[in-house]
Structure formats: C-alpha cells, structure tokens
Design a protein with these regions (language model features):
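Conserved AdoMet/S-adenosylmethionine-binding subsite of the radical SAM
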Residues: 1-120
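A C-terminal junction/extension of Radical SAM enzymes
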Residues: 111, 121-146
C-alpha cells in the first residue's frame, strides 16, 4: 500500500498481479492507488480450490469488487484433468460476463513443472476450443503459453 501511494505521487501507474486472496477492506483501500489488476482465477469449482488450499468465492468477490474500480483482466491456467471441461469454461465465462463482458480473459496452457509432472501439457486443441466457448460470453479472450 505504501509503495502504491508513492508511485501514484510520482505520476506512475500501479498494476497488481494477484491470486485474488484479499479481504474486502484492504482491497478497497488499495484500489484507490491501483490502475489495473490481473487476477488469477485458477478454476471455477470450489472442489479445485479446496484441493489447492483456496476459496473460489473470495477470488470471485475480489474480481467483482476490483472491476468496479480499475481495469481488470483474468487469467486461467488450464490443467488437463482438473479445470479443462467445456462446462466449467461455460460457467466461468458466463459468470465473468455477468460482472462485465469487457473483462479480458487469458486462457493459458499448462506445462508440467515442479510438483505437477504427473500429466502432459495442455493440448493446444483444448486451449483453442475453450477459447471459442469463452468468446460466446466475453468480448476479449486470449490464448497464452502456446
């Protein structure tokens, strides 16, 4: 927060890249100094967030609140067998469009690394097909890590 204030005083822009885990009160205070956010929406199922130690509703609330105050973009890393279903992308993109259909969505390709070497990289066909699905609800959809 302190750095954001100093940066604004210098006439510069603040961009936050975040997983979206922040309570409403500090987020509200921070947003006075933020120009843009890229929020990682890991999946659109509570079960996935429980598995990775998070909470979908908190991230959704952050996206909703931030979108009222600054430019927001959302990134979803597509992991084979975890969050790569067409139904999940329909739900995710429909919900995001209900917040604002102008919010850009970045659908990015997973590559096996670290503790997740037990699966292959996301097939390109999956990224492209999920992008088509999301584009039915959102104006700006981009494929990444391809």
């Amino acid at each position: 927060l302190n750095c954001s204030k100093l940066i604004k005083q210098q006439g510069l822009k603040n961009v936050v890249v975040t997983n979206g885990y922040i309570c409403k009160e500090p987020l509200t205070e921070l947003l006075y100094y933020i120009d843009a956010m890229n929020i990682d929406l890991k999946a659109f199922s509570e079960s996935f967030y429980k598995k990775v130690g998070g909470d979908l509703e908190t991230v959704k609330a952050t996206i909703h609140h931030a979108a009222k105050r600054c430019h927001v973009e959302v990134t979803t890393l597509i992991i084979p067998g975890e969050n790569d279903s067409e139904e999940e992308m329909k739900s995710l993109s429909s919900w995001l469009a209900s917040v604002n259909p102008e919010i850009p969505l970045h659908i990015t390709r997973f590559f096996p690394r670290w503790n997740m070497r037990d699966r292959e990289a996301t097939p390109l066909e999956t990224i492209y097909s999920l992008s088509v699905i999301a584009s039915k609800n959102l104006r700006y959809v981009y494929e990444g890590n391809i």
